[in-house]
């Protein structure tokens, strides 16, 4: 009779599962190779029964980083897989799945009985992904307990992600109350968007989000810092207690002023250095008047034009 817990039926979540798949198709083989290796402490799949008179099948063993439900394992590996809770050690399962010497996939390493794997697994994830965010998502408890050590390891490992792309820069200009911040909020998934704290140099809470919003900007970042943010080269930004790599693919700058007004012409050597980094200029249809959101619309300009008589994005 299926076990029940919290009103749910079916096998309880486990870390270690074995599975068999008879007569696998190429699509089914591909699916079994698709799950990211960061899911597993150890994963092995052998191909068996290819000689005449036997049923071709895949024989696999998965030791997941964290417990998985029966249905989740089916989702990862394929609905036709026959799945059971694993018995024996990782090494014994490795020997069983590889007994015919024809492996479809093997990743990770067999775990020993009682082996401490939380920190070592988090380290493996970190060195594989180069991302503290990935570690935090997959190993939250270990991340909280070992954040500083993991951060230092990332710095000295050479695995830290670095920007090697041009960050797109979108400037949204309009009077107060026209909906600039709403425009920025709707640009991308909130999960991947970081709102820069205003009027200071700190980037506390930034963890490599792909979209950065600099809201209500009027020149309060140092000129050189703004140019570096809007460029294409590796950059780290300061947090209270350390630095993090800047990995934004898009920067949204909202302002009541045009870029012409952000900095004094006597304070910057060549304002064109900023203009050529701007990807697009989005203006309220009449940015010189106090308008409500219902009374106008945002328009993407094609500079040089009357509203902004300088070339951009070159």
UniProtKB/Swiss-Prot annotation:
Q: Which GO terms describe its molecular function?
A: ATP binding; ATP hydrolysis activity; DNA binding; endonuclease activity; metal ion binding; nucleotidyltransferase activity; RNA binding; RNA helicase activity
What cellular-component terms does GO give this entry?
host cell nucleus
Q: Where does a divalent metal cation bind?
A: 48, 57, 100
This enzyme's EC code(s): 2.7.7.-, 3.1.21.-, 3.6.1.-
Which InterPro entries does this entry report, sorted A to Z?
A: CRESS_DNA_REP, Helicase_SF3_ssDNA/RNA_vir, P-loop_NTPase
* Swiss-Prot/TrEMBL keywords: ATP-binding, Covalent protein-DNA linkage, DNA replication, DNA-binding, Endonuclease, Helicase, Host nucleus, Hydrolase, Metal-binding, Multifunctional enzyme, Nuclease, Nucleotide-binding, Nucleotidyltransferase, Transferase
Know the name of this protein? Replication-associated protein
The source organism is Porcine circovirus 2
């Amino acid at each position: 009779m299926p076990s029940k817990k919290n009103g749910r039926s079916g096998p309880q979540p486990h870390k270690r599962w074995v599975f068999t798949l008879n007569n696998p198709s190429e699509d089914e083989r591909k699916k079994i190779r698709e799950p990211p290796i960061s899911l597993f402490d150890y994963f092995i799949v052998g191909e068996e029964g290819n000689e005449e008179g036997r049923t071709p099948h895949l024989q696999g063993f998965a030791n997941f980083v964290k417990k998985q439900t029966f249905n989740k394992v089916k989702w990862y590996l394929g609905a036709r897989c026959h799945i059971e809770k694993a018995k024996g050690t990782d090494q014994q399962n490795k020997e069983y799945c590889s007994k015919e010497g024809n492996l479809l996939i093997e990743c990770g390493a067999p775990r020993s009985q009682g082996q401490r794997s939380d920190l070592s697994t988090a380290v493996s994830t970190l060195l594989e992904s180069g991302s503290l965010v990935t570690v935090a998502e997959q190993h939250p408890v270990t991340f909280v307990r070992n954040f500083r050590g993991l951060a230092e390891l990332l710095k000295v490992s050479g695995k830290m992600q670095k920007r090697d792309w041009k960050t797109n820069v979108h400037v949204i200009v309009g009077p107060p109350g026209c909906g600039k911040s709403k425009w920025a909020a709707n640009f991308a998934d909130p999960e991947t968007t970081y709102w820069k704290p205003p009027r200071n140099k700190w980037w506390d809470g930034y963890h490599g989000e792909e979209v950065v919003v600099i809201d209500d900007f009027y020149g309060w970042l140092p000129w050189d810092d703004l140019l570096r943010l809007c460029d294409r080269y590796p950059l780290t930004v300061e947090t209270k207690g350390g630095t993090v790599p800047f990995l934004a693919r898009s920067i949204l700058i909202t302002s009541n002023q045009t870029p012409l007004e952000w900095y004094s012409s006597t304070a910057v050597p060549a304002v064109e250095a900023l203009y050529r980094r701007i990807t697009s200029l989005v203006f309220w249809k009449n940015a010189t008047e106090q308008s409500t959101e219902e009374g106008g619309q945002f328009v993407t300009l094609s500079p040089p034009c009357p509203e902004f008589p300088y070339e951009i994005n070159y």
